[in-house]
Structures are given as C-alpha cells and as structure tokens.
C-alpha cells in the first residue's frame, strides 16, 4: 500500500510527505506504516469517531457511524477514540495489540430487509457497493434499508415511486428494528453512568429515528455523512510510549517524565516539535510483579510538520 501510494502521488506530480491514519485517531508516517501495518487496522472507524467529535464540537460522546454495510459504535474520550481493554481476535487468532473499543452490527444502507408473516428483519446481509444497482429505488429487485428510508421520507435518493407500494406498517416496523438494534449497540458501549451525548454520522444516519438516548440529546452534525474524511483531515501526528517502570529505582514523577519524553520523541519528525502535546496518560500499578512496578502509557500528538 505504501509503495502504491508513493507511485500514485508521483504520477500526479505530488512530492510532499504523506501520512496514514492509525487506529488511535492519529497519523503515522509512511515509513512507520510500512514497519507496523497492523496499526492501520480499524483506522476507518476511528477517523469517523474523531470527525464526529470535531463536527459536533464535543470532546466526550458516544459515536454511531452508519455506513453501507455495518454500523460502528465507539466512544470519544477527551477528543480521541477510547481504546479497547479486551483482547482482539483477527482471523481466529488472539492478539494483544492496540485496537479501538468498538461494537459493530450488520446494519447499513445496503442491508437486506426481509419481510415475514409477523416480523421484519434488517441485515446482516447487504448489497454493499452494489446498492445503486440492486436497491428498489435504483431500479433493482432487492428491498434494502435505503428503500425503507426513502419510503418513509427520510432520504431523497433514487425513484421514490419504486417504493410507494410498501405498506406503511412494514416501513415503520423496519425502522423500529433498526433503531432498536442501534440502541442496544450504544448501550453496550456505555461503561459508566456518565451522561454522554450520542453523535449520529455516516451516510446511513437517516435510518435511525433517535432524538434522545437515556435523556441525552442525539446530535446530527452538519456534513455528518463525511465524518470519516473529516476525521482523517484533522488528525494530528501521534507518538506513544507503553512501558513498565520499577518505582524502587526512581520516583513516579521521573518515570512519567521518561514516558512522556519517549512519546514526544516518537511524535517529533512527522509533527512540529513545538506543537506536540501529551493528550493521554495512564499509570497502572502492577501488583503481581515484585517491588513497586507500574505500567505507564502516554500518547502525544501534534499537527504534521510543514
């Protein structure tokens, strides 16, 4: 991917440095991405989370990003995506590298809508990128969530006449199913009793009829359909330190200072050194190790260097 990007930019006559999004909401250099490609995993949802916070003007929130195939729900903490505390499985293998805390469900604009005798099912099957070929409003033959939104007057795309025959009760039942499943996913992301607003973004945001959630407002920011691109555009270069320190040999303040210096050093280069800030610091005592051991994790970030 790095080599292909270099070739594409060279073809366009662009010779400036370029960056890749990483899955903590910051940027990394092309060289760093080539060495640690795993850092790009799930960077798409983190861009949406950061972009949603920027567009809504909030630092702490729950973010719902509804795309064409899936809905991703994440948490924004102090302006950055919350990291998962659990192990992550990829291709059936347990991993221990950093990943954002996400709940994903198979509902999006391209989701199949199946109508039964007593209920309506939405997803997880989807027409995906073939939406404009297979959805009813685009002269296709598959009933999708987008068709439901058009029939309900929530979206103005395609040919509304193609879904005018849908019974109102079925349309309302499908929308209720979507809203119910999204509410459950949002509930799964709540780890405290803090009152957090919910930000709804993505091209499929009109599918959800929520105006409030547990007494908190649901924010639908302007330009929310491009929150992913916005999150990538506003991202800062990032650096991180994650080490265990023995406090029998140094003070806690010295350990924190060393960790901050390492995070800043990783960040400087792709970022302007004077603008680098510490955006996150966690210190976790490790009682199962001898002595006074503590795991210190520090994240630094700053705007890309000119």
Range-by-range predicted roles:
Residues 26-27, 31-38, 167:
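Conserved P-loop NTPase mechanochemical-coupling segment
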């Amino acid at each position: 991917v790095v080599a292909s990007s270099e070739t594409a930019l060279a073809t366009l006559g662009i010779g400036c440095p370029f960056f890749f999004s990483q899955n903590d909401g910051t940027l990394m250099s092309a060289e760093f991405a080539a060495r640690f490609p795993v850092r790009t995993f799930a960077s798409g949802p983190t861009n949406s989370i950061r972009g949603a916070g920027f567009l809504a003007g909030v630092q702490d929130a729950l973010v719902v990003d509804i795309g064409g195939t899936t809905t991703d729900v994440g948490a924004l903490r102090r302006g950055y995506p919350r990291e998962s505390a659990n192990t992550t499985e990829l291709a059936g293998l347990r991993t221990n590298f950093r990943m954002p805390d996400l709940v994903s469900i198979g509902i999006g604009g391209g989701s199949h809508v199946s109508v039964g005798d007593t209920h309506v099912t939405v997803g997880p099957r989807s027409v995906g990128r073939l939406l404009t070929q297979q959805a009813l409003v685009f002269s296709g033959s598959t009933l999708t969530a987008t068709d439901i939104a058009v029939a309900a007057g929530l979206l103005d795309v395609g040919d509304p006449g193609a879904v005018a025959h849908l019974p109102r009760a079925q349309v309302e039942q499908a929308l209720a199913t979507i809203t119910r499943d999204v509410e459950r996913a949002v509930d799964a992301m709540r780890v405290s009793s803090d009152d957090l607003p919910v930000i709804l973004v993505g091209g499929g945001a009109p599918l959800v009829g929520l105006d409030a959630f547990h007494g908190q407002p649901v924010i639908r920011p302007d330009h929310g359909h491009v929150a992913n691109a916005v999150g990538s555009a506003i991202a800062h270069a990032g650096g991180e330190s994650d080490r265990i320190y023995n406090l029998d040999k140094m003070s806690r303040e010295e350990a924190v200072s060393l960790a901050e210096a390492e995070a800043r050093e990783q960040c400087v280069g792709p970022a302007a050194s004077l603008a680098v800030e510490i955006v996150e610091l966690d210190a976790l005592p490790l009682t199962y190790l001898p002595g006074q051991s503590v795991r210190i994790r520090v994240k630094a970030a700053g705007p890309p260097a000119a």
